[in-house]
Each structure stands twice: as C-alpha cells, then as structure tokens.
Curated annotation (Swiss-Prot):
Highest taxon of the lineage: Bacteria
GO annotations of cellular component type: plasma membrane; proton-transporting ATP synthase complex
Protein's UniProt name: ATP synthase epsilon chain
Protease is among the record's keywords: no
Any one Gene Ontology molecular-function term assigned to this protein's record: proton-transporting ATP synthase activity, rotational mechanism
Keyword Phosphoprotein in annotation: no
Family: Belongs to the ATPase epsilon chain family.
Entry keywords, A to Z: ATP synthesis, Cell membrane, CF(1), Hydrogen ion transport, Ion transport, Membrane, Transport
Localization of this protein: Cell membrane
Subunit structure: F-type ATPases have 2 components, CF(1) - the catalytic core - and CF(0) - the membrane proton channel. CF(1) has five subunits: alpha(3), beta(3), gamma(1), delta(1), epsilon(1). CF(0) has three main subunits: a, b and c.
Gene3D superfamilies, A to Z: ATP synthase delta/epsilon subunit, C-terminal domain, F0F1 ATP synthase delta/epsilon subunit, N-terminal
Membrane topology: Peripheral membrane protein
Originating organism: Ligilactobacillus salivarius (strain UCC118) (Lactobacillus salivarius)
C-alpha cells in the first residue's frame, strides 16, 4: 500500500497490546452506529459498543477483534482502540465463551426472580459480551 493510503491500528487493553497492523479500512460499531475509518479521516473520538472491530487485510479478508466496549480515537492516520477486554477471532476460547453465556443467562433469571435491577443489567452486559465472542468465533 502507498504510504499515504494506510493507517495504523492499535488495539490495547489493561493487559497490553492485542492487535497492531496497517490497513486502508477499519470498521467498528460505536454507541451511535457503525463507522468506517480510512486514511486521512477527520480526527475522531467515540465510545465503542460491545461488538467487533474489523480490519481490512486484503480485498477479500478482514481480521476480526471482539471488543467489550471502550473507546476509539483517530488522528494522524493512527487509530487507537482502548477496550477493557479484546480478543482476536483466532484466540477466542469457544467453550469458555459458551460457559460465560450460560452463567450470564442463569444470573439473568436469578436477578429477575429477585427483582434486582443492578444485577440484571450486569448479567445482560455479560451475556452480550459472551454472545459477541461466540458470533465472532463463528465468522
């Protein structure tokens, strides 16, 4: 790729770097909708939804990273994704994600039975994270 037509993407969590690459397109879902970021995009700061970040590798393939919310910042052709948790598609432990989904579903039922709104919301977030990881692992 021509130097002017690439951007650098870094995905980091509190545990360290999860992904770094150069590309000409990144697609991610913010809390207000999906966005595509290309080289020379206007500076941007947005909060991420629990979803995937897709990084174009070539004309037909994308790297996929599951993110559990966080922020995306773009300036000077550098895209930084800061997330509390992130996993590349190839490192997702499907059986672990299935167990997390089952635990979250059980916690949702318990919270509903106890009319505990705080635990219910926490369990729903855990369920969305587990489902996101499972969906990305199956692409």
């Amino acid at each position: 790729m021509d130097e002017k037509s690439i951007l650098t993407i870094n995905v980091v969590t509190p545990d360290g770097s999860v992904y770094e690459n150069t590309t000409d397109l990144v697609i991610c879902k913010t809390t207000v909708g999906e966005i595509g970021i290309m080289p020379n995009h206007l500076p941007l700061l947005a909060s991420l939804a629990i979803d995937e970040v897709r990084v174009k590798v070539d004309d037909e393939n994308f790297d996929e990273i599951a993110v559990s919310g966080g922020f995306v910042e773009f300036s000077d052709n550098t895209l930084s994704v800061v997330a509390s948790a992130a996993e590349r598609k190839e490192t997702i432990d499907v059986s672990r994600a299935e167990r997390a989904k089952q635990r979250a579903e059980k916690r949702i039922e318990e919270a509903k039975n106890e009319n505990n709104d705080i635990d219910l919301r926490r369990a729903e977030v855990s369920l969305r994270r587990a489902i996101n990881r499972l969906n990305i692992s199956k692409h």
